[in-house]
Amino acid sequence: MDDDDFGGFEAAETFDGEQGGNQAVSPAVPWATFPAVSGVRLSPASPELILDHDHSSPSTGHLPPDAVISSADDTHADSSLMSQTISKAQIQQSAHTHLNIPLFPLGLTDEPSHGALALEDEPEGPGVHVSNSQLRQKISSLETKLKASEEEKQRIKKDVESLMEKHSVLEKGFLKEKEQDAVSFQARYRELQEKHKQELEDMRKAGHEALSIIVDEYKALLQSSVKQQLDAIEKQYVSAIEKQAHRCEELLHAQHQRLLDVLDTEKELLREKIQEALTQQSQEQKESLEKCLQEEMQRNKETLESAVKLEKEAMKDVITKAVGEERENLEKVHAEERELWKTEHARDQERVAEAIQAAVQEQQRMSQEAVKAAIVEEQRRSEKAMEEAVKRTRDELVEYVREQRRLDQVTRQRSLSSLELFLSCAQKQLSALIATEPVDIE
């Protein structure tokens, strides 16, 4: 059994095996020596199972293997849909972050003058080493899965950014297309103006009656054409603005609802996983401590009896008397250590429970604040972009309508002045013809 599961006895020295023939000096009484006993060593706590409290790596947070594996399987099962993939990846990352709580092994400490004993019985507990190796393998596999989940989250984040860029490109293309349509309408209007000017020149060459009829038709056609074009352009811009605003509202509503669902799901999963982890950890610690205490008491008793027996046979009468006194002192020290250990154990349990509760509350608060800030920022950006697009489109439309009206007014004035000049010339010619008719008759 690995004595480092519960911290071991720190600041102790190692007793070598009997084959080497070495003897170890007692840390409490330097002049009392003991022969080495097989299976007993003094060593510091093993660093393999001690979790560093200040370590910031994701591998320091240990969850129950079943809970983490089930959450990873759930994440990969729903990866076909974009929204579900995002929510699952966020839930898994948040659960990994919130449960990143280092658990300290419980160690049996003593005063600096005495040290402590760390017992390791490798032949009697092979099952514990197997379970420790399996636990290390599970932890490594869980770390690999968490790294894969982190990569999946980064990939999804890049996809979301690319989608937002595509959305902005499409919006720019839409505005550019509308500008091109406006330019084409202006070109068509100029073509109609040129065509109407040419027709006006042709009408000037025709007779007075045909000219008046054509002028009336031209005026009506010009007014109806300009009015239809203005109405069509105005309807197109209004419909485009309404569609864009409706689309932005739908996107904002869907995003808000999705974030709320993700937050609720994350809270529920974290609550269940934390409760399960605390229950399982408490049960495991209780069972392991009881078993460790029984085995340790038995080993201490056997070790002390064998050590005293060998020491009595090998040492002189004076050393034998000293060993007896040392044995009594050790029993008193063990009793005191046992009382100190019980007090320290209760104190450590209270500290661990308080630390876990404080960490869980802090992580929940930070997660809620981050999600709320992200929601508010995204809403503000979307509303600002929508307002700017609507305002810019409205200003361009108003400017275009004003320009068209001004051009129509100028063209109408020119046409009327030209028509008035033509009519005055025609009237003068008719007057001249009427004046010359009596002379011809005479």
Curated annotation (Swiss-Prot):
Annotated region (GGA1-binding motif) at 1-16
* Modified-residue entries (Phosphoserine), positions: S43, S46
Positions of region (Homodimerization): 211-414
Listed A to Z, the keywords are: Coiled coil, Golgi apparatus, Membrane, Phosphoprotein, Protein transport, Transport
GO CC terms: cytosol; membrane; nucleoplasm; trans-Golgi network
Q: What does the entry give for GO biological process?
A: Golgi to lysosome transport; protein transport
Q: What InterPro entries does the record point to?
A: CCDC91 (IPR034592)
What does the subunit comment say? Homodimer. Interacts with GGA1, GGA2 and AP1G1.
Q: What is this protein called?
A: Coiled-coil domain-containing protein 91
- The organism named in the record is Mus musculus
